[in-house]
């Protein structure tokens, strides 16, 4: 086969980074579905009750993680979506997937805010990453509380994620922080962290709409 067959056609525009993430996410979701189906088939094909129960439990756990993954896919809606509802679904799926099993209480207090679907998706990605960092680093993988608050003031959306852990600023996660800052920049906003003896607070501030590029 000619190497030329593998060249990208100049008429095909390259995918933007977040579009690429979306495409990969859909493929991962399909892989979850196939893995769950395989576990169900294996469970149905065994006569050992303990093995069947273990396979069923593994399938249920994988299904919960798949649900959390799907919650972070870009909203199907083209127009504005209710940010509170969208983030609430993300938080609920993360609780079912892992937080509840570690004794983490995830509390959500969000105003009804209608935001363009692409912006809502990015906020959801940021919130999910901040929750993961709070659970893993702030709470150290153990029990505790994480609070998500979303409010609108003077044309700005303010989103805070706080925990009651003991993470110091010096130990702040690096890779997750860079991801959050990059997404915040795409939204035309910023994110700041505060570390106190009572826990960590990360606050995202973004405009309701992104000003057109000059």
Q: What positions do the PLM features span?
A:
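Conserved short strand/loop->alpha-helix "switch" segment adjacent to the catalytic nucleotide/phosphoryl-transfer site
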Residues: 7-25, 79-81, 99-129, 136-139, ...
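Short beta-strand element(s) in the Bergerat
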Residues: 104, 155-159, 200
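Conserved phosphoacceptor histidine of two-component systems
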Residues: 19-33, 37, 41
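Conserved DHp (HisKA) dimerization/phosphotransfer helix of two-component histidine kinases, i.e.
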Residues: 34-38, 48-104
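Short C-terminal beta-strand
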Residues: 160, 199-210
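Short beta-strand/loop element within the Bergerat-fold HATPase_c
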Residues: 143-155
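ATP phosphate-binding glycine-rich loop and adjacent ATP-lid/helix-beta elements
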Residues: 169-198
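Conserved DxG motif in ATP/Mg2+-binding regions
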Residues: 159-165
């Amino acid at each position: 086969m000619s190497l030329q067959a593998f060249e990208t056609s100049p008429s095909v525009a390259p995918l933007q980074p977040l579009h690429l993430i979306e495409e990969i996410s859909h493929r991962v979701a399909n892989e979850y579905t196939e893995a769950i189906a395989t576990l169900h088939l294996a469970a149905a094909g065994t006569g050992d009750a303990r093995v069947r129960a273990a396979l069923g439990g593994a399938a249920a756990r994988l299904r919960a993680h798949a649900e959390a993954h799907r919650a972070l896919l870009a909203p199907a809606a083209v127009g504005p979506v209710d940010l509170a509802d969208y983030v609430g679904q993300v938080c609920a799926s993360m609780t079912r997937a892992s937080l509840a099993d570690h004794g983490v209480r995830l509390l959500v207090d969000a105003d009804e805010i209608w935001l363009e679907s692409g912006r809502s998706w990015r906020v959801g990605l940021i919130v999910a990453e901040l929750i993961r960092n709070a659970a893993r680093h702030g709470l150290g993988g153990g029990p505790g509380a994480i609070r998500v608050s979303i409010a609108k003031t003077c044309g700005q959306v303010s989103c805070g994620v706080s925990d009651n852990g003991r993470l110091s600023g010096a130990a702040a996660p690096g890779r997750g922080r860079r991801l959050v800052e990059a997404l915040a920049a795409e939204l035309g906003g910023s994110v700041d962290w505060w570390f106190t003896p009572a826990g960590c607070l990360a606050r995202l501030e973004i405009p309701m709409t992104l000003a057109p590029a000059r």
